[in-house]
A protein has these predicted regions:
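Glycine-rich, positively charged N-terminal anion/phosphate-binding segment
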Residues: 2-10, 25-100
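Conserved radical SAM core fold
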Residues: 50-56, 84, 107-120, 178-183
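Glycine-rich tight-turn/loop motif centered on a GG-T
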Residues: 111-128, 182-190, 247-252
Length: 353
C-alpha cells in the first residue's frame, strides 16, 4: 500500500502538513536543525527537551532554545520533569513562547533524568504520569502529546498499559519508540507494539524508531496504522533523508552538502553565539561530510579547527560552487525579526532525549 506522506492530519486542533515528524533530540534539535527539517519536508518539528527544574530555578542560561521562528510552525516544545505543578508552569511558558504543541518526555533513558523520576522512569509510575499529563492539559489550551518508550525493562509492554491512561488524562497524541530504556539505541524497534497501541487508543499515534528511508516509513505506517513517522538519528547532518522519505530520491551534490553545512554553522552561531557554537558544531562535521561524501581526513581536519571562519574557508575551498547554493539558501530564509524570543523567560536546557 502506497501511503501519501504529504497527507495532512491533526494533532488536537493543530493541522500538521505531512506524516513526517522530526524528532526531539538533546544536543541536536536547536532552531537551525528544526528550520532545516521544515525546509526538507518535516510536517512537525520538535525542540530538544527542556527541564522544568531549570524553569523553576530561573536559571540564567541563554534563551536561544526558546526562539520560535516564523518558518518553524507547527512546532512542539518538549518538557521533562516529575512535579505536576512545575510541569504546568513550564507548559504555560511554552505557550507564551509561541509553540503550537506541548510535548512531554516519558521516554528519555539517560540516568541523570530517570533518577529524578522523570523520563522513561514514569512508565513505572503510571499514576504520577497521568497526574503530569492532566496538570499540563489543564494548564494550557495547546494540545499535549507524550513521547514514550515501550517500558524500562527489556521485553516490557508497559506502554500498552500506560498509553490509554495518558489519553484519558488529556494526551491528544502519543509517540512510541518501541525500545526499552535499558536498550537505549541498541537492537531494533519492535513496531508490533506500535500497532497494538494504535488499536487501544483513539488519538493519533506517531511511530518512532529505525525510520531511515521512504520504504521503511511506508512499511511502518502500513503495518501499524500510525498516523505519522518520526525520524531522529537518521536526519543528523542528513536532511536529505527527509527529502527521500517524502519522495525525492536525488542524492545531494558536494556543493549542496557544503552549502547546507555552512548555513547550519551560521544559523547556529546566531543562535548560540560563536564560543558555544564552536564546540557544539564539531559532531555535525562528521554527520554532514560522512556517508562517503568527503574523505575522512578532511572531516578530522575540520574538527581540530578552533575558528569557524577557518572552517568556512576550508569548506568553500573543497566545494567552491557551494557559495552560490548558499546565497540562494540565505535569500530564502525569513527575516530574523519574525522570531519570538522571550527575554524575560530564563530557562535551562539539559541533555537527554
Amino acid at each position: 500500500m502506497n501511503i501519501n506522506l504529504a497527507d495532512t492530519w491533526f494533532l488536537g486542533g493543530v493541522e500538521i502538513p505531512g506524516r513526517l515528524v522530526l524528532a526531539p533530540m538533546a544536543g541536536v534539535s536547536v532552531q537551525a536543525f528544526r528550520r532545516q527539517g521544515r525546509r526538507y519536508g518535516a510536517g512537525l518539528v520538535c525542540s530538544e527537551m527542556v527541564s522544568v527544574a531549570g524553569i523553576q530555578h530561573r536559571n540564567e542560561r541563554t534563551l536561544e532554545y526558546l526562539r520560535v521562528g516564523a518558518d518553524e510552525h507547527p512546532l512542539a516544545i518538549q518538557i521533562f520533569g516529575s512535579d505536576p505543578v512545575a510541569m504546568a508552569e513550564a507548559a504555560r511558558m511554552v505557550e507564551a513562547a509561541g509553540a503550537d504543541i506541548v510535548d512531554m518526555n516519558f521516554g528519555c533513558p539517560v540516568k541523570k533524568v530517570t533518577k529524578t523520576g522523570a523520563g522513561a522512569s514514569l512508565l513505572d509510575d503510571a499514576d504520577l504520569a497521568c497526574r503530569l499529563v492532566e496538570a499540563v492539559a489543564t494548564a494550557v489550551p495547546l494540545p499535549v502529546s507524550v513521547k514514550m518508550r515501550r517500558g524500562v525493562e527489556n521485553g516490557s509492554r508497559r506502554c500498552l498499559e500506560v498509553g490509554p491512561r495518558l489519553v484519558q488524562a488529556g494526551a491528544a497524541s502519543l509517540t512510541l519508540h518501541p525500545r526499552s530504556a535499558k536498550q537505549m539505541y541498541t537492537g531494533t524497534a519492535d513496531h508490533s507494539l506500535t500497532a497494538e497501541l494504535v488499536s487501544l487508543v483513539d488519538v493519533p499515534v506517531i511511530a518512532s524508531g529505525d525510520i531511515g528511508s521512504r520504504a521503511r516509513a511506508q512499511s511502518v505506517l502500513a503495518t501499524t496504522g500510525a498516523v505519522a513517522v518520526m525520524v531522529g538519528r537518521a536526519a543528523q547532518g542528513n536532511p536529505w533523508v527527509l527529502r527521500e522519505i517524502m519522495g525525492n530520491t536525488a542524492e545531494p551534490s558536494r556543493e549542496e552538502v557544503v552549502a547546507e553545512l555552512l548555513l547550519f554553522i551560521r544559523e547556529t552561531v546566531r543562535e548560540l553565539g560563536p564560543e558555544r557554537a564552536t564546540g557544539f558544531l564539531k559532531k555535525f562535521y562528521g554527520w554532514y561530510l560522512g556517508r562517503g561524501r568527503f574523505p575522512r581526513p578532511f572531516k578530522q581536519e575540520l574538527v581540530t579547527m578552533t575558528s569557524l571562519d577557518e572552517v568556512e574557508t576550508r569548506l568553500l575551498a573543497a566545494a567552491p560552487g557551494a557559495r552560490f547554493v548558499l546565497e540562494r539558501l540565505l535569500d530564502e530564509l525569513p527575516d530574523p525579526a519574525d522570531e519570538v524570543l522571550l527575554d524575560s523567560l530564563p530557562i535551562s536546557i539539559y541533555g537527554g532525549g
